[in-house]
């Protein structure tokens, strides 16, 4: 009996030792794998994220999962007043909530906003509209020079910008350290009196790499001469932060308005009210910095790229969570002690409050534009409408900044609501002035037409979706195919990696529904 017990104990011990040895060997294998690093020369073809996979396989595999975020909301159908607010501008044609990074480049190509160029010198938008979509952009800035990159039409680089947002946008290919790859961010930080990327802590860098794109910006018209002395004009991405950003819980929107007014800048002239307008981009950084998480030093990556554990390996999840509430155990619950359901309820309440003020603000803004258009029709002069247009310009930018980054209501809920209320207030002040102006010109009972559906709003904005869609499909069948053919021939991207990226014929479009 004693012999049997001794034998059993020995077998258990041997088994445990075998498991321990296996575990040690597996951890050693993982350690060696993690110790792999590119040579001092860096990663050849670093713009292709798959070239990083041999060194960082887990990060690459999680990055590929950005493909899973393939749904979107047609924001113009959800909020038709936006069409009136942006009438005469590309956003009145097509505006969707973002999908995963995997789709960012193709969605840019497919958007009605980028038009239907027929060659490298045609189309409505400048090259700057590629800037936040691909690691090929910093490559082109390095190869061609910053001013040359920002000179010309969007279609100029159609066959060159083919790799979607990936490793090389945020990492040094020699060390994998975080790195800013575009020059406008540091210039903006310096203008705001903030530390540059290189001067910042590692924790701050985990937000600043995101701020390369998730910021408010405009295209600064810049005259220059090339090496041959030829005069050229660049449209350079520039951050309007000279009056500060994220101070004392304020995103800096009023400072941006002051900046834009002082340089007499406008993105476009509204085709109904004839107001020189400003279009907010995606100011995620500014609102994060003014909100409680930013003030407490919680980075973008803490919530959107939380650490995950695989065996003995801890790494940052590069799926870039669209909604951290989908993985609360990895993000929220590392700090918060409330239940998941309670936290979800709090976030939902913030969203509902934003939605309410959003509807009120843009209803007033849309009506202010239409009433101004009626005043013009009745004979009101530019001088009579000067204050009205100033209020519309300022009010719409405040409200637009509040919603242009879809997570603002969470990142800085108080600032989001403040700006929506302020924008609505400006629009209402404009409408009160318009009552007097309209009456002066004999219009006593004008009621703005309905714009409660996307179709009604686009008709008022004179947006011909059928014609725009036909032009876009022709572009996709011609010039875009030439781009793809050239990119493939020159080995600029891996067609296999992106074979499913174009979902235009799968109903994943606001204008080409199947």
Curated annotation (Swiss-Prot):
Cofactors required: Ca(2+); heme c
Alphabetical UniProt keywords: Calcium, Electron transport, Heme, Iron, Metal-binding, Oxidoreductase, Periplasm, Signal, Transport
Binding-site list for substrate: 217, 282
EC number(s) on file: 1.7.2.2
Binding site for heme c 4: 300, 303-304, 411
Described function: Catalyzes the reduction of nitrite to ammonia, consuming six electrons in the process. Has very low activity toward hydroxylamine, and even lower activity toward sulfite. Sulfite reductase activity is maximal at neutral pH.
Protein name, per record: Cytochrome c-552
Source organism per UniProt: Sulfurospirillum deleyianum
């Amino acid at each position: 009996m004693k012999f049997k017990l001794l034998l059993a104990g020995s077998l258990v011990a041997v088994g445990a030792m075998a498991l321990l040895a296996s575990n040690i060997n597996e951890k050693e294998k993982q350690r060696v794998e993690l110790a792999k690093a590119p040579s001092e020369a860096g990663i050849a073809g670093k713009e292709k994220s798959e070239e990083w996979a041999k060194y960082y396989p887990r990060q690459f595999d999680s990055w590929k999962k950005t493909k899973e975020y393939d749904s979107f909301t047609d924001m113009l159908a959800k909020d038709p007043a936006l069409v009136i607010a942006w009438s005469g501008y590309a956003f009145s044609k097509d505006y969707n909530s973002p999908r995963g990074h995997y789709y960012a480049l193709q969605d840019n190509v497919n958007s009605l906003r980028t038009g239907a160029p027929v060659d490298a010198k045609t189309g409505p938008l400048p090259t700057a509209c590629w800037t936040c979509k691909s690691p090929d952009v910093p490559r082109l800035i390095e190869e061609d020079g910053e001013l040359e990159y920002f000179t010309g039409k969007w279609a100029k680089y159609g066959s060159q910008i083919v790799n979607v947002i990936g490793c090389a946008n945020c990492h040094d290919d020699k060390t994998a350290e975080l790195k800013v790859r575009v020059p406008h961010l540091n210039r903006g930080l310096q203008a705001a009196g903030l530390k540059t990327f290189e001067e910042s802590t590692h924790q701050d860098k985990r937000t600043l790499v995101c701020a390369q794109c998730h910021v408010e910006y405009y295209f600064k018209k810049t005259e220059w001469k090339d090496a041959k002395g030829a005069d050229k004009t660049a449209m350079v991405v520039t951050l309007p932060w000279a009056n500060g950003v994220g101070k004392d819980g304020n995103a800096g929107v009023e400072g941006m308005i002051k900046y834009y007014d002082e340089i007499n800048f406008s993105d476009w002239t509204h085709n109904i009210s004839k107001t020189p307008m400003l279009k907010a981009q995606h100011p995620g950084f500014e609102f994060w910095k003014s909100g409680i998480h930013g003030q407490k030093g919680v980075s973008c990556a803490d919530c959107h790229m939380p650490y995950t554990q695989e065996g003995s390996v801890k790494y940052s999840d590069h799926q870039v969570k669209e909604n951290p509430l989908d993985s609360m155990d990895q993000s929220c619950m590392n700090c918060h002690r409330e239940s998941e359901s309670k936290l979800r309820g709090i976030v939902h309440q913030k969203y509902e409050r934003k939605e309410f003020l959003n509807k009120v603000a843009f209803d007033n803004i849309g009506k202010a534009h239409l009433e101004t258009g009626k005043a013009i029709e009745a004979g009101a002069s530019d001088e009579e409408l000067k204050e009205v247009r100033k209020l519309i310009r300022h009010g719409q930018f405040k409200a637009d900044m509040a919603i242009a980054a879809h997570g603002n209501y969470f990142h800085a809920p108080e600032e989001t609501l403040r700006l929506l209320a302020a924008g609505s207030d400006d629009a209402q002040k404009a409408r009160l002035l318009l009552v007097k102006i309209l009456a002066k010109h004999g219009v006593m009972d004008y009621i703005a037409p309905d714009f409660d559906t996307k179709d009604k709003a686009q008709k008022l904005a004179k947006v011909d979706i059928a014609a725009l869609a036909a032009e876009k499909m022709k572009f996709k069948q011609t010039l875009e195919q030439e781009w793809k053919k050239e990119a493939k021939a020159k080995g600029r991207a891996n067609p296999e990696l992106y074979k499913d990226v174009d979902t235009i014929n799968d109903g994943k479009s606001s204008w080409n529904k199947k």
